[in-house]
Amino acid sequence: MALNLRKNHPLLKIINDSLIDLPTPSNISAWWNFGSLLGICLITQIVTGLLLAMHYTADTSLAFASVAHVCRNVQFGWLIRNLHANGASFFFICIYLHIGRGFYYGSYLNKETWNIGVLLLLALMATAFVGYVLPWGQMSFWGATVITNLFSAIPYIGQTLVEWLWGGFSVDNPTLTRFFAFHFLLPFVIAGLTLVHLTFLHETGSNNPLGIPSDCDKIPFHPYYSIKDLLGFALMLIPFISLALFSPNLLGDPENFTPANPLATPPHIKPEWYFLFAYAILRSIPNKLGGVLALAASVLVLFLIPLLHVSKQRSMTFRPLSQILFWTLVADLLILTWVGSQPVEHPFIIIGQLASFAYFTIILILFPIVSALENKMLKL
């Protein structure tokens, strides 16, 4: 009998084992669709980004004009740019929902997969930040100035580090050039990390909504989940393309339509919406180093989540107290996002401080306490 090429060819075998014959739990819900959606986001961003890079000039005197040129003179340049700009927003929507799913269902107990995932989030945040600087508008320039300046809070080496990062004494041409280099490189680092993420995931197999072993009831990925993923793609691409075509500037800052001017500071410097929660935490501490540490901790706390798991159950499906805490945390993050977009004045300052305090308290203190309480109530 002839060998099945799909199962025996050195390259096709890898694809087969991860996308076709992969044994998958039979009960994973739509919350498990976001991994493949993130893959689609990454591919979209790399393709549109490559097309934009062909027309972009990484020079302070030409960057803004080159972006305008793409939108005016390049065939479908406006569409490519709008897809790339809004693709970043959808990338973050998907990754936040994906992390939320992992948190709710206890997927973080696959520690290697989770830790690589957190590294992926950090790489994505770095990519988005350096990318936002490239159009060289007002918010690009001042955003870069404010965020890179945070490194100067590091004791002893801070100032030297910032000047080394800038390539001078302020954000200028060398900064823009290196940021373009980083923005081009990092997505490929993300693609590499994604393969590592999947490699670790396929060592253990997917978790499921019940948080129990599912080896006794696995089904092949194709056709069941391949068709489900296609539905997910359609449901994401429809709002994504609608946003890019009907209101492409909805999520952007109008300040970025003004070319960068080091002599005029915008009245309200704020990052894109997906960084606002962290920005609110940064601003809520009236001390530079303290704010920087809180900012770093707001994302790095994700590394601690597997260590803080004290429940005897993996998933939150049958833990109503933890569920209440989880949705309180979600609401808290939405409050932080809103506060981050507001000016630094009363009552936003105190709201931001309370929300920041609540964020760390819920994750580091309340979740372990409530989990232990649930164990006791269930006599586990």
UniProtKB/Swiss-Prot annotation:
Xref: CDD domains: cytochrome_b_C, Cytochrome_b_N
Quaternary state and interactors: The cytochrome bc1 complex contains 11 subunits: 3 respiratory subunits (MT-CYB, CYC1 and UQCRFS1), 2 core proteins (UQCRC1 and UQCRC2) and 6 low-molecular weight proteins (UQCRH/QCR6, UQCRB/QCR7, UQCRQ/QCR8, UQCR10/QCR9, UQCR11/QCR10 and a cleavage product of UQCRFS1). This cytochrome bc1 complex then forms a dimer.
Methyltransferase listed as a keyword: no
Pfam family, one: Cytochrome_B
Any GO BP annotation: mitochondrial electron transport, ubiquinol to cytochrome c
Protein name from the UniProt record: Cytochrome b
Additional remark text: Heme 1 (or BL or b562) is low-potential and absorbs at about 562 nm, and heme 2 (or BH or b566) is high-potential and absorbs at about 566 nm.
Keywords: Electron transport, Heme, Iron, Membrane, Metal-binding, Mitochondrion, Mitochondrion inner membrane, Respiratory chain, Transmembrane, Transmembrane helix, Transport, Ubiquinone
Residues annotated as binding heme b b562: 84, 183
Gene that specifies this protein: MT-CYB
